[in-house]
């Protein structure tokens, strides 16, 4: 009965199981123990039959599915992973080969280099777009107008022109644009502050482009640029101020030597006669009112007698005179006549007639007309000495001006005097400006007054009642509060004749005609 039952189970198992191998395995397992010994059929029949039945059912359900899943998973893995890896590697190799074939060179750092222009690109796509600039290829075309582009992004931005689409809109107003950077620039207009500030006039702007446009019109900025350029030129030519402070030797009780401010000026102008340089700027002692165009510097700076202040004042005056030269134009300046210097005299130095004065012991002349001055100039070709006797009382009343005015102005010679805080070392003839040096050929200066004899002729006060510095033109008798404007005005006077326009060469009869000519700007060039 047990054998039949077992056989019946076997037959049943054979009928139910889809494969015969599982049934045979079940039979073999029932006939053996884990120890390899044969168990009795009566003892192991029920337990082994139940276990084998359960295992056979589970294996019948799992094994076909697991094999199919394994096959499918293997097929899918091989079809997805391996082709992706192979395709990426092949694509990279193909791109590298194509780029190398087209002119791309792989660098050791992984970047690509164009063999046409040597441009280094970070990747193959960038190099591919760059190569189109050499080949002229534009694969992206607009269907509406036919415009072609090298990149797809440029085509998409171009299509927005036809559709009128403006996706970037301002949250504060109705402004809309097609590009993000344009919206970013527009949003700055709604900001409260103005970060872009002009350092020369103090104006502020919200955009840098507006500041750059302002600099093209900013007078202070343009003036500073010209002054810096002139200062760089003068730094190579102007000697230091210590060289200018030469002592004034006294020859004897009756003869004094007129000091020359900068001897290097003669050597400099000998090689360059067509240009006017600020070789001997005037120096002023006392409180000096300096006006700067920079907002970060106080407008009123009172400089004392320190040496640094004097050097700073001299440097600014050099720049101001060069600015006047730039304003007037170098082509309008007339060249000077330079005579060959002679040997040095025993008592005093001998210099060119273009920068010297002849002091006769018995008389002092003031040429009235240009003819007399020309005749006087012809007599000055020989050695010229700067030695002159000390002034007489009647000569002290003469005007220190070199204006070469007509005889009708002689009665106002007392008004021509200019006060320099009672310091005779600041006489205009000692600290000469370039205009005074050129005019010395046409006029003879009055002698220098003794210390303490000069008095303040005029005083200029501001709105607060404080006395301020003023500069007087000895030729036109005009006061200037700004030294730059004073220097520009002095540059309008001729070198030889103060009443001759230094711009166009027009010769005026008197100072009124000269002032009218300058104010009206009636310059005619022949």
From Swiss-Prot:
* UniProt record, GO biological process: positive regulation of transcription by RNA polymerase II
SMART domains in alphabetical order: ZnF_C2H2 (SM00355)
Tissue expression remark: Expressed in outer hair cells (OHC) of the organ of Corti. Abundant in thymus, low expression in bone marrow and brain and no detectable expression in spleen, liver, kidney or muscle. Expressed in T-cells.
Q: Name one GO cellular component term.
A: nucleus
The record's keywords, sorted A to Z, are:
Acetylation, Activator, DNA-binding, Hearing, Isopeptide bond, Metal-binding, Nucleus, Phosphoprotein, Repeat, Transcription, Transcription regulation, Ubl conjugation, Zinc, Zinc-finger
One Gene Ontology MF term = DNA binding
Which chain segments does UniProt annotate as zinc-finger regions (C2H2-type)? 112-134, 140-162, 168-190, 196-219, 471-493, 499-523
- Where composition is biased (Polar residues), the residues are 29-50
The protein's location, in the record's own words, is:
Nucleus
Q: Where does the record put the Glycyl lysine isopeptide (Lys-Gly) (interchain with G-Cter in SUMO2) cross-link?
A: 95, 442, 448
Query: Where is the stretch described as Disordered?
Result: 28-94, 368-435
As stated in the Swiss-Prot or TrEMBL entry, residues carrying the post-translational modification N6-acetyllysine are 288
Q: InterPro entries in the record, alphabetically?
A: Ikaros_C2H2-ZF, Znf_C2H2_sf, Znf_C2H2_type
PROSITE patterns linked: ZINC_FINGER_C2H2_1 (PS00028), ZINC_FINGER_C2H2_2 (PS50157)
Modified-residue entries (Phosphoserine), positions: 56, 78-79
Q: Where is the composition biased (Basic and acidic residues)?
A: 61-77, 368-379
What Gene3D superfamilies has UniProt attached to this entry?
Classic Zinc Finger
Q: How does it assemble?
A: Can form homodimers. Interacts with IKZF4 and IKZF5.
Family the UniProt entry places it in? Belongs to the Ikaros C2H2-type zinc-finger protein family.
**Function statement:** Transcriptional regulator required for outer hair cells (OHC) maturation and, consequently, for hearing.
Q: Report the protein name in the record.
A: Zinc finger protein Helios
Name the gene for this chain: Ikzf2
């Amino acid at each position: 009965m047990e054998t039949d039952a077992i056989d019946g189970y076997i037959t049943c198992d054979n009928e139910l199981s889809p494969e015969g191998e599982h049934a045979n395995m079940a039979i073999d397992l029932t006939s053996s123990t884990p120890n390899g010994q044969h168990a009795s059929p009566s003892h192991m029949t029920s337990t082994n039959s139940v276990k084998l039945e359960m295992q056979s059912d589970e294996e019948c359900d799992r094994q076909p599915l697991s094999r199919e899943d394994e096959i499918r998973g293997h097929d899918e893995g091989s079809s997805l992973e391996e082709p992706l890896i192979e395709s990426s590697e092949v694509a990279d190799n193909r791109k590298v080969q194509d780029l190398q074939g087209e002119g791309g060179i792989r660098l050791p750092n992984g970047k690509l280099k164009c063999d046409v222009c040597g441009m280094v690109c970070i990747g193959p796509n960038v190099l591919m777009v760059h190569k189109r600039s050499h080949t002229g290829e534009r694969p992206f075309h607009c269907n509406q107008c036919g415009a072609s582009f090298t990149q797809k992004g440029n085509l998409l931005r171009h299509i927005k022109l036809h559709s009128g689409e403006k996706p970037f809109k301002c949250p504060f107003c109705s402004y809309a644009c097609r590009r993000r950077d344009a919206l970013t620039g527009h949003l700055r207009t709604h900001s409260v502050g103005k970060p872009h500030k002009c350092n020369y006039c103090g104006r502020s702007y919200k955009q840098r482009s507006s500041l750059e446009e302002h600099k093209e019109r900013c007078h202070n900025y343009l003036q500073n640029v010209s002054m810096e350029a002139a200062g760089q030129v003068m730094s190579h030519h102007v000697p230091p101020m210590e060289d200018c402070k030469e002592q004034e030797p006294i020859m004897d009780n009756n003869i004094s030597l007129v000091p020359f401010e900068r001897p290097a000026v003669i050597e400099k102008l000998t090689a360059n006669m067509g240009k006017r340089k600020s070789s001997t700027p005037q120096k002023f002692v006392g409180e000096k009112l300096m006006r700067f165009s920079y907002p970060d510097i106080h407008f009123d700076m009172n400089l004392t007698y320190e040496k640094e202040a004097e050097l700073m004042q001299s440097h600014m005056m050099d720049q101001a005179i060069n600015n006047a030269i730039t304003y007037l134009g170098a082509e309008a300046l007339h060249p000077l006549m330079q005579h060959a210097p002679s040997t040095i005299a025993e008592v005093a130095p001998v210099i060119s007639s273009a920068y010297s004065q002849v002091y006769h012991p018995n008389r002092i002349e003031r040429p009235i007309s240009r003819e007399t001055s020309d005749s006087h100039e012809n007599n000055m070709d020989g050695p010229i000495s700067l030695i002159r006797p000390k002034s007489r009382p009647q000569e002290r009343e003469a005007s220190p001006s070199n204006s070469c005015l007509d005889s009708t102005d002689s009665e106002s010679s007392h008004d021509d005097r200019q006060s320099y805080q009672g310091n005779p070392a600041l006489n205009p003839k000692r600290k000469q400006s370039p205009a005074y040096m050129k005019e010395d050929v046409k006029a003879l200066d009055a002698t220098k007054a003794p210390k303490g004899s000069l008095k303040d002729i005029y005083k200029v006060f501001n709105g607060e009642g404080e006395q301020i510095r003023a500069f007087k033109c000895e030729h036109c008798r005009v006061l200037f509060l700004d030294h730059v404007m004073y220097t520009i005005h002095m540059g309008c006077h001729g070198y030889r004749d103060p009443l001759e326009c230094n711009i166009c060469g027009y010769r005026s009869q008197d100072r009124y005609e000269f002032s009218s000519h300058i104010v009206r700007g009636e310059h005619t060039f022949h």
